[in-house]
Amino acid sequence: MYTYTVNGTAPCAADQSTVTVNETSSPNAGTDGAITTCSTSAPSNLFTALTGAQAGGTWTAPGGAAHSGTLDPSTDAAGIYVYTLNATAPCVSDQSQVTVTINTPPNAGTDGSVTVCDVGAPTALFGELTGAQAGGTWTAPGGGAFSG
């Protein structure tokens, strides 16, 4: 409590007033973070990507819709998720963000089989797989490299 005093001139007495100061802590939404996950990974808590954040805030998804804070990479979108901690006046609210990257799992295709003659022409094995994405590597029986 702070006291303000004005001295009076005799015969008047001094006069005092007081001011009580109530301090409110400002919110801390933490330091921004990032999560990189696979679309087939288990759900994870966005809060764990923030450093030093206070609990009790709210999450919004990319586009601004409310979000639970539990990222399900099979259904949620990649992008920026915002964590907001509201403040009590005169403090201002604080925000942090988690940048989410969701990768698609690799697809080596569906297993296949082929019968070849031991003296026949070379066979391109990649064509024996169904739905395989390009860019993989082949390994021969015994572990050696193979061009496919």
Language model features with spans:
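Proline- and Ser/Thr-rich low-complexity, intrinsically disordered segments
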Residues: M1-G148
